């Protein structure tokens, strides 16, 4: 399960207004994160049926839940499977523990479940609330990679970790994006590992948190993809939305750190429907619909579809932290669509 997020505040100037109202989803670029932190959620088999009936072709789960993995058998749904932060130390310290984890949670299902990525840790930094896990991320990634390779799955399943915008020391303008000094020694070896193994970097990208952290300088239309014209001119790059700016700042940081060939997969992005500033059903609907439409075309810095996972499938009434954390769902626990988004 994704932990409570502390998002960096990104200062950007904004202009304009336009609303995009219709959407179709690129089946190869959109997934939805499935969190289970609620006491009123459907069964795993019901959830898989809901994905299939809505044409959602990819899923992220935050731990190797056996009911979910079993329900995924034969579904053709592609999967990001997380190694929870609490498991990092054991998998980093003992290669046999990593091999057992991979055998039990991946190999045993791999003939019928379409694993795409293993996310070894979520939003871990050497500073902040998850700092105690930082030293274990790369060793755990290496041990999981070794186990995946031993199973002959290295071409099918890529090992990565899920980061977020807090790794950036500078993010504006996007071309000046760079990793903060206290993060560089942590992230640079991870970048080298990803490059060596042909794996993407997973990144949770949230314009919502950037906007709510600095509403004096960031306008809502820029965060919602509804600005009518160029908001940020960054050399030859023109930005009409904050999502692109955040993602390209991370790409710029990767380039400066020797990871210019790495792909970024957006492993989470969403907007809450209640519980905080600008958290309304209308804003969330606008964000999700426009995001789905937008990621088919790339960013100013990187062309091509952006593989993206929406956060999240359901409202989760047992999430901790900010009240907004409970209200990111695309569906209610009763399996009703909150936004009437077409997935076909």
Swiss-Prot record:
GO molecular function terms listed in the Swiss-Prot or TrEMBL record: glucan endo-1,3-beta-D-glucosidase activity
Claim: Signal is one of the keywords in the record: yes
The keyword Signal is annotated on this UniProt entry: yes
Domain of life the protein comes from: Eukaryota
Enzyme class, spelled out: hydrolase
Reactions accelerated catalytically: Hydrolysis of (1->3)-beta-D-glucosidic linkages in (1->3)-beta-D-glucans
Signal peptide boundaries: 1-27
Keywords: Glycosidase, Hydrolase, Pathogenesis-related protein, Plant defense, Signal
PROSITE patterns noted in UniProt: GLYCOSYL_HYDROL_F17
Pfam families on file: Glyco_hydro_17
Catalytic-site annotation from UniProt: 123 (proton donor), 268 (nucleophile)
E.C. code: 3.2.1.39
GO biological process: carbohydrate metabolic process; defense response
Annotated function: Implicated in the defense of plants against pathogens.
Record family assignment: Belongs to the glycosyl hydrolase 17 family.
Protein name, as recorded: Glucan endo-1,3-beta-glucosidase
Source organism: Vitis vinifera
């Amino acid at each position: 399960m994704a932990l409570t997020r502390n998002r960096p505040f990104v200062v950007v100037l904004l202009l304009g207004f336009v609303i995009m109202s219709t959407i179709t989803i690129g089946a190869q670029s959109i997934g939805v994160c499935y969190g289970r932190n609620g006491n009123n959620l459907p069964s795993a088999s019901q959830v898989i049926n809901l994905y299939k009936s809505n044409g959602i072709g990819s899923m992220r789960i935050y731990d190797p839940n056996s009911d979910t993995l079993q329900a995924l058998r034969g579904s053709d749904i592609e999967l990001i499977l997380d190694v929870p932060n609490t498991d990092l130390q054991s998998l980093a310290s003992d290669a046999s523990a990593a091999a057992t984890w991979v055998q039990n949670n991946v190999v045993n299902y791999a003939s019928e479940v379409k694993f795409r990525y293993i996310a070894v840790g979520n939003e871990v930094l050497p500073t902040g609330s998850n700092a105690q896990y930082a030293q274990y991320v790369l060793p755990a990634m290496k041990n999981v990679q070794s186990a995946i390779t031993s199973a002959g799955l290295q071409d099918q399943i890529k090992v990565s970790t899920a980061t977020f915008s807090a790794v950036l020391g500078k993010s504006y303008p996007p071309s000046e994006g760079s990793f903060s000094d206290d993060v560089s020694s942590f992230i640079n070896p991870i970048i080298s590992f990803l490059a060596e193994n042909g794996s993407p970097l997973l990144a949770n990208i949230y314009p919502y948190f950037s906007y709510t952290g600095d509403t004096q300088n960031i306008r809502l239309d820029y965060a919602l993809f509804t600005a009518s014209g160029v908001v940020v001119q960054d050399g030859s790059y023109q930005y009409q939305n904050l999502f692109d700016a955040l993602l390209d700042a991370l790409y710029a940081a990767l380039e400066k750190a020797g990871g210019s060939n790495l792909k970024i997969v957006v492993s989470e992005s969403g907007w809450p429907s209640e519980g905080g500033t600008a958290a309304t059903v209308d804003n969330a609907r606008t964000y999700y619909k426009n995001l789905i439409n937008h990621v088919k075309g790339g960013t100013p810095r990187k062309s091509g579809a952006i593989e993206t996972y929406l956060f999240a499938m359901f409202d989760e009434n047992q999430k901790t932290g900010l009240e907004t954390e409970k209200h990111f769902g695309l569906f209610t626990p009763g399996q009703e669509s909150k936004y009437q988004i077409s997935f076909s």
